[in-house]
Structures are given as structure tokens and as C-alpha cells.
Amino acid sequence: MNDPIADMLTRIRNSQLRGKSTVITPASKLRAWVLDVLADEGYIRGYEKITGADGHPAIEISLKYYEGEPVIRELKRVSKPGRRVYMGVNDIPVVRQGLGVSIVSTPKGVMSDQAARSANVGGEVLCTVF
């Protein structure tokens, strides 16, 4: 697997399109940090670290729906392994005029675009969520 973040985002997107309540993805610290931001922003109900069927660590993500529709309408990977996207604090994109969120990996940790602006740090823009 070349891009674990893109894999996790695709699993979430596909599971929501199928109406699943949970999705399981392999565990990593970066994935957990991204999920922390998604949970804090209200895009997922939460997640829990489990042991997968193969004995490897995994993460079970509880997806969130509102009136039967997925809360996440759009989930896009911005920085990719072949083309990293780094932005200063003033260049971090505003998603859908502030209705969405950019998830940024900064020297102070993985955080939302608003938190990065508050902390006055830039970094690698991992993905956008709306």
C-alpha cells in the first residue's frame, strides 16, 4: 500500500456510500491522528483500536449519518506520495467558504485548518472534508 491515508479515506467514502455503520482499516498513528480531527469536527462518531481478524492492529471507525444521509459529502486527498503539498499558515485553503475542513500535518501535530491558523503554523495539507 503506497498511500495509507488515501486508502483510509477511500474505505470511509465507500462504506458511507453503502450505508455501513462502521468500517475497519489497518492501524497507524497518522491514521489515528486524522481520525481524531474528523471526530473533533463532528464528521465521524468516533473510532476504536481493535485487533483485526489477521491478528494485526486495526481501527474500527463509527460513521455518522444525519437523516439517513452521510455527514461527509466530499473527502479528497490533497498531498499525495508523488506530489506533496506544503502550505504556509496564510495559504491553507478554506474549504467551501468555511463549511468544510482541511486537515493539516504541522510540526505541532495533525490539526484542522482553523486550529493551524490559531497556532500560526503551516504544514502538509493531507486532505479536505466537506
UniProtKB/Swiss-Prot annotation:
Keyword Ribosomal protein assigned: yes
MF term (GO), any: structural constituent of ribosome
Example of a GO biological process term: translation
One Pfam family from the record: Ribosomal_S8
Gene Ontology CC terms: ribonucleoprotein complex; ribosome
Source species, domain of life: Bacteria
Entry keywords, A to Z: Ribonucleoprotein, Ribosomal protein, RNA-binding, rRNA-binding
Keyword GTP-binding attached: no
Assigned protein family: Belongs to the universal ribosomal protein uS8 family.
Function per UniProt: One of the primary rRNA binding proteins, it binds directly to 16S rRNA central domain where it helps coordinate assembly of the platform of the 30S subunit.
Protein name: Small ribosomal subunit protein uS8
Classification of source organism: Bacteria, Pseudomonadati, Pseudomonadota, Alphaproteobacteria, Rhodobacterales
Gene that encodes the chain: rpsH
